[in-house]
Amino acid sequence: MTDVLLANTLYRLREKLHAGPATSGIRKKRSLGAHSTFWQPGQTLRISFTGTPDQWLKRAVFQTASQWLEHAYLQFELVDDNDDRAEIRIRTDVAENVNYSLLGRDSQWVTGASMALGVSLSDPQFDQIVLHEFGHALGMEHEHQHPHAHIPWNLDALSQGLAQALSQEQKDPQELLTAIETELTTQFLPLAEDDVQPLLPYDVESIMHYPIRQAHTWGNWEVGQNTKLSQKDKRFMRLLYPAPGQNGCRRT
């Protein structure tokens, strides 16, 4: 089982430690559904790729991401490469295990790419990674941070593993441990209920839930790979982006 959560954590830590506090990454602290990051129902979101990515990859990403549109009153439009006006701007020139996205309308407040997809077309996890990152682009947060998830994280084991992986790259042990502690707090532990609107029940089958290894938790707690949109994922989209005449549940 590929540990996507750990790979992304290592990537963020390297970005922070190498860039320094002034430029320590573009992702903001997020909630499962932060109202200020939602798009408008019925809006057309333009998708542009940076650089000169493979045409087959672009089509596959667009086709897979469009599965969300079956449950959300939104449209996607694939526009020319390197279009800075696009709401979703994707770079693919990253390491294969690097995949991330800004949350919803946060993409409007940064320059350059708002999403990175290092996954290759041949990767068996291609669909689930694309769906997961586009879930973020539509305003969804990681399900493992749901206020009611109650995941028994073994934070000591996680911290030790991350420190060992980065020990040769960071000369200041205390700075490294502080960065790891901050990352575990903001990216692993549950969010406050007040930060989550709308709050639906915790869903271990959500495409937004990373697989979790038993080695990173106490007891026998683990989660396998989720490969498709769950019923809650679909309902969440209908609440955020209701079609005309349908009832939604979102802050404005």
Predicted segments, located by residue:
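Zinc-dependent metalloendopeptidases
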Residues: M1-T252
